[in-house]
């Protein structure tokens, strides 16, 4: 072959390239929900500074990597991805970039036009210079764009149909043996389009970098702060704001600034040397800048103060070459003793030191070890993913950790086409693998770097280590995309501090003789331990009038000690046969399921052949951990965040109350049989499974829902940490007894929350023979969103048992609907869709069902939506006998057609704050009988805590607890809504927050008002229709909200609120547990909580307020996940939040629970 240089006409690299791999070609909706894949309580409110440096040197025009391949340009293997990784790879899907613009203040996104195979653009961004790839293709050696004519160096003067060479390998073959390659012409519409995409957007280093950076940065949140620069352009320096660099001031990554960044990427032109050290200097010195355009300004460009001292700063440095033609002046920083800003002393040590001065590594160490802003506090969060409590010094100097609390710069370096040069120390795919151990142990030294020296390739690796960042080496376009995304995930991970344990808990009671022995199952997770989780069993006893927990076992420890790499685990998935299940093994997977697992999550889901190893990894095999394709786990058991355990032992219901529901079912016989059932505890985890454990902590069963299968492979990624976290089976399992198929069964309903859009039902009657009843996903119900709502199992008037649930959030059409699902078959019995505001995302939340006449059959359902509407649904016949409106005499399948949205399709109430803004409802309402015995008081709270933006406390408005009187609950035709507003309700307030001591127990408490509600006028007409309580103390807004289910017991309603931290430099959230009068929403007339921790509730737990002792309305408690109702050893009710239980008084003359279900947790 011959090489040719020819003119291709006027061309530049201008275009509009933008895109995220997962987005469709449709214009994005500005109001679309952003469901977080990270636990919000760990997210800080301060976004990091991100400084991006891209290489614009002349070698970025090359269509090969590494540089040495130019000498092989006339050989056939130059046109093979096996030899030249920049060349077309038939196994890689080359995704089109997207164009980002701003229209009417909203970001708009659309796909770039597909390049045609018969008229493909040489530069896909400028859409200039076309080539007919079906006949005129010539492999590119170098492509140089610019404002004038573009030039291209290519192989052979004579065009041909597009092709690649396939390496056959085999005996006697090497990558440079021409006879071992077979020429393959591009054929078929799909492959031709893929080749055209590669040719127009990926075939050179520059084009691949533009596309890869765009695909990675597209998903960066809008609150990130970003500036950018090139190596060679004097008018494109970090933070300069130059118009020639698209106004690259440091700004929030939103609006026009976001568009500017993508425009800068799209207009990248190349030419010049590789002055990496000058670029590093500009980035490091920029962090020292003060003022309104500085890196610590509150709103850069607008407002300087307050300057948050916890804001991290990261430098992303991408290059394809070795630094040259520049200088630095930091000396041999990594070999010079010095005092660090936190008082620690550094002396020359591995793996930081070397013998050379003024290297990139020296600069990286200097800008890590120097306090960029000594005038502000040192509050950067330490990042310690590898703790070493036995040796704090080793922990501090482990470069995988970043203990620096001062303002400093962490650098991530990315080399393109350099891997084959990294031989001593040897690069093996990640910063701390390969030859790194030799460096750390002192058996090898970092090669000395100097101007334009071949050793400078190691300086990129060394620099990343010295700054507590990471080095990435990519050789192909798909690796480049993955590397950029990995870097952003690592930064997000460092921005996510370690978690606290015991996020949720569930209590199990167990009767043994005349003594009540109590057990608690607590879940926990640790983001700083590679997203490990645990389920722990405790016994609960009372000592000195306080509840004491004694740890019995840890499911994590038992599972991790399991022999044979998980081979013996019973992990099931949907299958055929009588059980509806099959083993999760490689051989049992369908071809499509194998394809899904044959994807490399570290390389942008490129196809590979590691699927069988991924199955083994997910089953618990740890033999391949910490290799090129598999991460290291601290535990096989994944993080358990929002899923509360459910226990299954004896029958679920009280026999004498359940028997009349299905007279032919003989529940007493069923209940007697279940007395000997082996107890189990079920819980969902974000390792892709619902787990079942016995009472000794042994895993006996696991189930992988089909709705999470598509992203199972992500769990194996080396980059699965921090911001790469995904939710999987994150919902709380719901267990109930139900009658179908002529028999009673115990069923488990599973949901996923942010893990996916799906529901499933398992028959767990026999724990040794569990059956899958059904699964539902978007294919079966398009309006199913993320399954945040908690399902309810109920007998309905159509004569069938059903699962009743809200449709969830972020569904296809963003609608809200109540789903009624046949429990036995999974068929949708009815979908009751509600109205809402157009253009505003909606979704129905968890429902609460009402059984008006206590016959065990649901008559009404209540649920709220994201637009703040409280809905009622009539689950009764259209026409009823008013003398006996809920009679079961007319029950039958036809009744289902009469199920409807009450009040003519209008809400019972629409929640808005004092300014008229809608208040989202995401927790299930609670119901109490109205004191007049007419209807219900429907109690519900407002607040939303699942989008990324919800992590920061919203102190601009109040969320509210409401009690609304629904008077029309006797089966009458409720054809019109009461149309209530706040003006129809009695206001209550939180009047006091104080620190106090109750019999030596220190607490922070709150006192609510006690305003009476005047329900009726003298003539019996309605005067007030309820009450409301804004969550603020003396008018002070903290962002408090209600997102967990409440508990109504006796004459008190118990609830727990959450308040995201209003300090942007702190993670976490605070919680308040309230006990309020359900009839007024205010302070109770009796003492509710045993704040003195004496096992009973009396006046010792009162508080002196306005010269009298009053009941405390709320107390601050630790732990998230809502409240669990139980009983203590004295038989008194208590409410538990994670580790603390408080005895509660439900009020005087309180009757027993009027419900045919037993006390929660009773077996």
UniProtKB/Swiss-Prot annotation:
List locations, semicolon-separated.
Fimbrium; Membrane; Cytoplasm, Cytosol
Say if the entry is tagged with keyword Transmembrane: no
- Residue spans making up a coiled coil are none
Q: Name one GO biological process term.
A: type IV pilus-dependent motility
The main place the protein resides is: other
Q: Which InterPro entries did the record assign?
A: PilY1_beta_prop_dom, Quinoprotein_ADH-like_sf
GO molecular function terms noted in the UniProt entry: calcium ion binding
Question: Which cysteines share a disulfide bond?
Answer: none
Q: Which GO terms describe its cellular component?
A: cytosol; membrane; type IV pilus
**Which residues are involved in binding Ca(2+) 2?**
851, 853, 855, 857, 859
Q: What residues bind Ca(2+) 1, as annotated?
A: 600, 602, 604, 608
Q: Which UniProt keywords apply?
A: Calcium, Cytoplasm, Fimbrium, Fimbrium biogenesis, Membrane, Metal-binding, Signal
Q: Which residues form the signal peptide?
A: 1-30
Residue span of region Integrin-binding motif RGD: 619-621
Phenotype upon knockout is: Loss of surface T4P which is not due to the lack of major pilus structural subunit PilA. Lacks measurable twitching motility. T4P fibers are restored when pilus retraction ATPase pilT is deleted at the same time. Does not bind to the injured regions of human ciliated airway epithelium (HAE) during bacterial infection on the contrary to the wild-type which preferentially binds to the injured regions of the HAE.
Q: Which Pfam families match?
A: T4P_PilY1 (PF05567)
Q: Where is this region: Disordered?
A: 329-352, 1138-1163
Task: Say yes or no: keyword Chloroplast present.
Answer: no
The entry sums up its family as follows: Belongs to the PilY1 family.
The entry describes its oligomerization and partners as: Interacts (via C-terminal 532-1163) with host integrins alpha-V/beta-3 (ITGAV/ITGB3) and alpha-V/beta-5 (ITGAV/ITGB5).
Something else the entry says is: Residues 600-608 comprise a calcium-binding site which together with the other one (residues 851-859) seems important for interaction with integrins of the host.
Q: What exactly does this protein do?
A: Involved in pilus assembly, twitching motility and adhesion to host cells. Primes type IV pili (T4P) assembly and is required for inclusion of minor pilins PilV, PilW and PilX to the surface pili. Stabilizes assembled pilus fibers likely by antagonizing retraction mediated by PilT. Calcium-binding and calcium release by PilY1 seem to be essential for twitching motility and for regulation of pilus retraction dynamics of PilT. Adhesin for human tissue specifically recognizing a host receptor localized or enriched on basolateral epithelial cell surfaces.
UniProt-recorded name of the protein: Type IV pilus biogenesis factor PilY1
The lineage, from the top, is: Bacteria, Pseudomonadati, Pseudomonadota, Gammaproteobacteria, Pseudomonadales
- The UniProt gene name for this protein comes to pilY1
